[in-house]
Amino acid sequence: MTTPTPRPRLIAFDADDTLWPNQPHFDHVETQVVALLAAHGNAAHIGRELYNVQRRNMHLFGYGAKSFMLAMVETAIQLTNGAVTGRELQPLLDLGKRLLDFPIEPLPGVVEVLTELTRRGEPLMVLTKGDLFDQESKVARSGLGDFFAHVEIVSEKNEATYQRILTRYGVHPEEFVMIGNSLKSDILPVARLGARAIHVPYHPVWIHEEVPAEQLAGVAYHRVEVLTDVLVYLK
């Protein structure tokens, strides 16, 4: 006899590229950064250096627009061997500031899904990683905040983080559902805890969130092509 799946006591949504577009804004800014620094390398080289600086500094600055701004400045210093001027750095800073206040428009299906889950009385949470001020601002600008009973902004999404969240809210893994676009951050650590994970693919994907296919072998998670399909899965 199959044991029925318990009703979720907590349904968490990732924010960036799940509730609203985020990566396209960063990609657009990176294209402009490459153009500004074109005298110091080709596009592939500059993009690679920018990501390497970000990755190297993640333990110091974490994720988000401010970290990206610092990476732009450090990359410019490296590519110019320290010769970059304040006049040349200012456009980079201006680009970074745009990432802190771009308009937030919910992705297709988001309002429909949140409205229906709220009607059903489901307990909803935003669970996102990044800079506290930046992510709080995005939630506010999105107009979606009233759908969520809880907002959790964390510095990293791994098994330890999810376990802390479950413990804090008194929820067992089988009573928790995580919905997000990142296999690395939203799916793998949740599935490894024995909780339910729903993958909603989004493109483009930041290189840092890519997962080799072999890491997915044997991992139990559910994939939907559009967010509205989660309403059927969670019925």
Question: Where would I find each of the regions flagged by the language model?
Answer:
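Asp-based, Mg2+/Mn2+-dependent phosphohydrolase catalytic module
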Residues: 1-8, 111, 115-119, 131-235
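Active-site neighborhood of HAD-like aspartate-dependent phosphohydrolases
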Residues: 2-49
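Short, acidic loop-to-helix structural element flanking the phosphoryl-transfer center
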Residues: 7, 65-67, 86-125, 159
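An amphipathic alpha-helix signature
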Residues: 26-34, 69, 73, 132
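Short helix-capping segments at alpha-helix termini
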Residues: 39-43, 81-83, 143-146, 170
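A metal-dependent, Asp-based hydrolase signature
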Residues: 48-98
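Short amphipathic alpha-helical segments at helix boundaries and their inter-helical linkers
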Residues: 58-67, 100-108, 161-164, 189-196
